[in-house]
Curated annotation (Swiss-Prot):
Annotated family: Belongs to the Integrator subunit 13 family.
Protein name: Protein asunder
Subcellular location: Nucleus; Cytoplasm; Cytoplasm, Perinuclear region
Keywords on record: Cell cycle, Cell division, Coiled coil, Cytoplasm, Developmental protein, Differentiation, Meiosis, Mitosis, Nucleus, Phosphoprotein, Spermatogenesis
Region (Disordered): 560-579
Any one GO CC term of the record: cytoplasm
Keyword Phosphoprotein: yes
Organism expressing this protein natively: Drosophila pseudoobscura pseudoobscura
GO biological process, alphabetically ordered: cell differentiation; cell division; centrosome localization; flagellated sperm motility; meiotic cell cycle; regulation of fertilization; regulation of mitotic cell cycle; spermatogenesis
Gene behind this protein: asun
Coiled-coil region list: 516-538
Extent of motif Nuclear localization signal (NLS): 601-607
Length: 674
């Protein structure tokens, strides 16, 4: 009912510091021809605004935008602070206008440079008065209180924008603490009788630290920070010439606005009426003017104007042309518009053009490269509106075909199956509570392919007689008999795959597929069956069926390389208990086969239990033993008995003795070594 942006209070610092120049010089060479040497040397043709003038102009422009777009709905107040707080206007509608504010600002005037430098001159006086002003009810809040609405249901929030100049972060922190303390004290006064105004539910404090051009500030910028449950604070340091851009950026977030720049406006030159040039005009309006128009096929062209920090949507001026009623798009909404620079010549020409009863169409580009007329500017009753036109499919158009989906034309949607699913899933009111209602969502399908080409399982349900019944059993409660029947169907499917039968697809036309392609089809069918059973495995019988199918799928690809034992084990898992071969084997089974199967089962369990009891040391020792067995051990360890020391190089020196003995036997002398 009462939003935070319903109340906005500007606190302007009127101390001596704001009398200095902003250091942005404006030329005053209005005469034709070259400037004289005397004027250029003396610099008499330039002047610079003061910090106070920059703050006043930008804040008044802020409230002009608010009052243009929200006439009578949003309120803005001004408080000037020097030795005391000076109230410029009130919440009354008679003072909520530009004439009253500008006349009051003229009476306040620029701060005097001869003003004494004293601690009595402070912005804190204005902040205290701003908190008291927030506690005062507006006309709408007074009407709600008079109608009997409790005070706790009347939301009282507001925003305070303080334009000042601080030395450093410590001074700024002191300012925040004082504001928070006064805010808490004001709520205490409002809660205790006699009540002094409304309690403040929340306050948003925006501090703009203004410095002249080219001066570095010791105050750092800070995003929105929660100081207390009642107060959020953000700090911005900005040069005096750029304060208007900063407030324009802030007003977009404060009032959920958007900036649009109308480009390529043909306009005659002021000095030469025979020629024309293209100009741009920036306007502000509600953000919904763009959000309700754009569809998935459109992207907003944005740009950032020089000197600004916010994005603006660029829409191109569309040359007016004659069109019939069939060419007009339906309007989705209309929103008030106000120009950013109301005093510029392009803005004035566009406003007069619209107020004279003309309309302007605006174009925006599509993603495909073409353009579409998305907005229209027109005036009614002295107010300018932007109309959001419907450039996407509207409710008055025929419904699109389901086959015209994204990515091209799709012709194989399962339309009839989807219709059956919708009929099965329709909701009806019940007079009494159904005890089976909690189990109904579980019975709904959890797997539904949209197209026929994306599924193998549902493509075959018209050609395999048992498949529809199989799919029906998966989504309902299953008993033992249903499980046996499904096992039988899986067994028949496995037998068909073993024989090399081709799945009865429609597109094959009876042609014989290659063996590897048929095998891939069965593999895809097994995979989709497993996915379907997994999503509906709610009972023990479903889980048993899932285990059988998982075993079949894991072994199907490696079936040719399996041994006979593996094949027998595979058959024990894949065959249904009611299959003819299985029934015959069960009738002729002997005690020995039963004993063998039990022994195999016990052996497998024993291996699993032994594997589970192995420690990390056993695993490492086993790995080292297997690695050492691959190479021959040292011969000294093999030949030397346990407890004795093996002799290193036992044959060392024996070769010389053998050579001398052989020489003596043959009578040949061997000379000793030197």
């Amino acid at each position: 009912m009462f939003e935070r942006n319903q109340k906005t209070i500007f606190v302007l610092d009127h101390t001596r510091y704001f009398s200095i120049a902003s250091e942005e010089y404006i030329s005053m060479d209005f005469l034709k021809g070259k400037p004289s040497a005397h004027s250029s040397a003396g610099g008499s043709s330039q002047f610079s605004k003061s910090l106070w003038t920059c703050a006043c102009e930008s804040s008044i422009e802020y409230c002009r935008v608010v009052w243009d777009l929200f006439p009578g709905k949003k309120h803005v107040r001004f408080i000037v602070s020097d030795t005391a707080a000076h109230i410029v206007n009130t919440w009354s509608a008679s003072t909520q206008n530009m004439s009253h504010v500008m006349n009051a600002m003229v009476m306040v005037g620029v701060p005097s440079r001869s003003m004494p430098q004293s601690s009595d001159y402070s912005v804190i006086h204005g902040l205290r008065a701003a908190i008291e002003a927030l506690a005062e009810p507006t006309d709408e809040q007074s009407q709600a209180m008079a109608s009997g609405v409790p005070d706790d249901l009347i939301l009282n929030e507001g925003r305070v924008i303080c334009i000042t100049s601080a030395r450093d972060n410590t001074s700024m922190k002191s300012l925040e603490d004082i504001f928070n303390t006064v805010l808490i004290q004001q709520n205490v006064l409002s809660a205790t009788p006699p009540k002094k105004g409304l309690g403040i539910n929340h306050c948003h404090l925006v501090i703009l630290n203004i410095v002249p051009l080219g001066i570095d500030s010791m105050v750092t910028n800070r995003n929105l920070l929660e100081i207390s449950p009642l107060l959020d604070v953000e700090i911005h340091t900005v040069g005096a010439p750029d304060i208007s851009y900063k407030l324009t950026h802030l007003i977009l977030d404060h009032y959920d606005l958007a900036s649009t720049t109308v480009t390529n406006i043909p306009m005659k030159e002021e000095q030469n009426a025979n020629s024309s040039a293209n100009y741009d005009v920036e306007i502000l309006h509600s953000r919904r003017a763009h959000s309700i128009t754009c569809g998935p096929d459109f992207s907003l062209p944005t740009s950032i104007k020089q000197g600004a920090t916010y994005e603006t949507v660029t829409l191109k001026w569309c040359t007016p042309r004659g069109c019939g009623s069939a060419d007009l798009q339906p309007c989705l909404g209309q929103f008030l518009v106000t120009p950013v620079d109301v005093t510029s010549r392009p803005s004035s020409c566009l406003i007069n053009f619209l107020l004279n009863g003309r309309s302007v169409l605006l174009e925006m580009p599509r993603k495909t490269g073409s353009k579409a007329t998305s907005h229209m500017l027109s005036a009614r009753g002295g107010e300018i509106f932007i109309h959001s036109l419907c450039i996407t499919r509207s409710c008055m158009d025929e419904a699109p075909s389901i086959a015209d989906g994204p990515g091209g034309r799709v012709n194989d949607y399962r339309t009839s199956e989807l219709g059956q699913l919708m009929k099965m899933s329709r909701m009806v009111p019940l007079k009494s509570r159904d005890p089976a209602a909690p189990n109904l969502p579980r019975r709904l399908p959890r797997y539904f392919p949209l197209t026929t080409t994306s599924t193998v399982l549902f493509h075959l349900q018209r050609h395999l007689s048992w498949l529809p019944h199989f799919l029906h059993l998966l989504v309902k409660e299953m008993d033992k008999q249903d499980e046996v029947r499904c096992q039988q169907h899986i067994h028949e499917l496995y037998k068909s795959a073993s024989r090399g039968d081709v799945l009865p697809f429609t597109h094959t036309n009876g042609a014989r597929l290659k063996p590897h392609k048929a095998k891939d089809q069965y593999r895809l069918l097994y995979r989709e069956l497993e996915q379907l059973i997994q999503l509906n495995a709610s009972t023990v019988h479903h889980k048993n069926l899932l285990e059988s199918l998982q075993t079949l799928r894991a072994a199907y690809g490696d079936a040719p390389s399996k041994s006979e034992a593996g094949t027998a084990n595979l058959r024990s898992f894949t065959e249904s208990p009611l299959s003819p071969e299985r029934l015959e084997a069960m009738s002729n089974v002997s005690i020995s086969s039963s004993t063998n199967s039990n022994s195999l089962l016990k052996a497998s369990k024993r291996r699993m239990s032994n594997c589970g009891t192995r420690s990390l040391l056993d695993i490492i020792s086993s790995a080292e033993r297997s690695q050492s067995n691959k190479r021959l051990d040292f011969s000294g360890r093999i030949c030397t008995p346990i407890g004795q020391i093996a002799k290193l190089y036992p044959d060392f020196g024996n070769k010389e003795k053998d050579a001398a003995a052989a020489a003596a036997a043959s009578g040949v002398g061997v000379a000793p070594k030197e």
